Amino acid sequence: MSDLITDLSRRDFTMNAIALSADGMIADPFDGVSDIAKRTIRCVGEPKLRFTEDALRMFRALRFSARLGFTIEYDTMQAIEQCAPLAAELAPERVRDEIEKILLTTRPETMSAAISFGLMKKYISGAGWKTPNFADIADMPRKALTRWVAFAIMLRKYGYIPSARDFLMQLRLDGRTIRCCADAEVLLSQEPPRDDLGWKKMLNRYGVDTVTCAVQTYAVIYGIDREKELKNILKSGECFSLKHLAVTGDDLLALGLKGPELGEMLNFLLEYVMEYPDNNKREILLELAKYSEES
């Protein structure tokens, strides 16, 4: 039993320092069961010592609070504020993984606490001119890509970071998420599409994931929902990319087109079909390609 108690004494929080002994009895030397009943997150022993052993435990405390709806006990919270500078020594990948887990909970606003405690100072250079309402992120689909993009762009908009893209790169996010965020940031600086053709051109240039993220982030930041318009375009089945075009490069090769001419013709036909969606038919497009080539 003494070995078990020693092992439990090294755990992070009391709720995680509960075990069954060899004789089937519950070993709970730090009152973890009681803390669970009180919905409380409390460090095992001296909080500063636990956080000095592994600074990631500070993020874990916030993550458990976000996921379970538990309250962080006063001494533990005070220790997080005092030990926050230790978070700068953590590998970005470890910090990234904890942030993502928080963002994917029903309480993403917990990231405001991480920022105010100083856990993010290595990545957030500014004080910000307004506190982002990260709680709104909970209304977005529970997808890592979507929530990372919204989180980074909100930080950028309110002056906490100079670049959403660079912020995600610092945290070692994957290339797809970084590209999506950079493009979504560009889209948010532009006027929204005014018609179906505008939506299709945007989808063609940036892709479904990026446009969807931008639209959902736009709703979170500005309170204006344009997602219905986007969904209508996607449900319509109208062509906005070469993969939806009724003809392929092989079809145009058969007409004698090759090299740059073939690519130019495909793009011409795509532009035509985006404007006249009912004409996305193989026969019509082949005839148009022949006519255009002859003229």
Q: What are these model-predicted stretches?
A:
Residues 35-42, 218-231, 247:
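Conserved, surface-exposed functional patches that form binding/active-site neighborhoods
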Residues 185, 252, 256, 276:
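Hydrophobic, well-ordered secondary-structure elements that form the walls
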Residues 15, 36, 183-188, 213-217, ...:
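Charged, low-complexity, helix-prone segments enriched in Lys/Glu/Asp/Gln
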Residues 132-224:
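Divalent metal-dependent catalytic cores for phosphoryl transfer on phosphate-bearing substrates
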Residues 226-268:
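C-terminal accessory/binding modules appended to enzymatic or scaffolding proteins
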Residues 2, 6-170, 244, 261-266, ...:
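Glycine- and charge-enriched loop/helix tracts that form the active or gating conduit
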